[in-house]
Amino acid sequence: MAKVSAVNRNNHRAALVKRDKEKRTALKNIIKDRTLSVEDRFDATLKLAQMPRNGSATRVRLRCKLSGRPRANYRKFELSRIALRDLASAGQIPGMVKSSW
């Protein structure tokens, strides 16, 4: 089990990303638009720099929904390899069977 504070911190970051997504993408589009003046693009760069860092999508870590484990996660299931193995062996994941040959 991961520390509760680490999981809560990550959840808070995800909420900030969701909240600031439109504003960030608008500023990034202004920065990339070569038809605008240099001053407008620079102002957009300064505004983007003033936004909180935790609002960036790269700051959010993919964590297991059950254990909060930050590594070895399957995106499709949003579970760590350990939790996925436990649930699959218990028959909790439909269609997943242990392979044998």
Swiss-Prot record:
UniProt keyword annotation of Ribosomal protein present: yes
Pfam families, sorted: Ribosomal_S14 (PF00253)
GO CC, any one term: cytoplasm
Keyword vocabulary terms for this entry: Ribonucleoprotein, Ribosomal protein, RNA-binding, rRNA-binding
PROSITE patterns: RIBOSOMAL_S14
One function term, GO molecular function aspect: rRNA binding
GO biological process: translation
SUPFAM superfamilies xref list: Glucocorticoid receptor-like (DNA-binding domain)
Function of the protein: Binds 16S rRNA, required for the assembly of 30S particles and may also be responsible for determining the conformation of the 16S rRNA at the A site.
Similarity-based family: Belongs to the universal ribosomal protein uS14 family.
Subunit structure: Part of the 30S ribosomal subunit. Contacts proteins S3 and S10.
Protein name: Small ribosomal subunit protein uS14
Organism listed in the record: Gluconobacter oxydans (strain 621H)
Highest classification ranks of the organism: Bacteria, Pseudomonadati, Pseudomonadota, Alphaproteobacteria, Acetobacterales
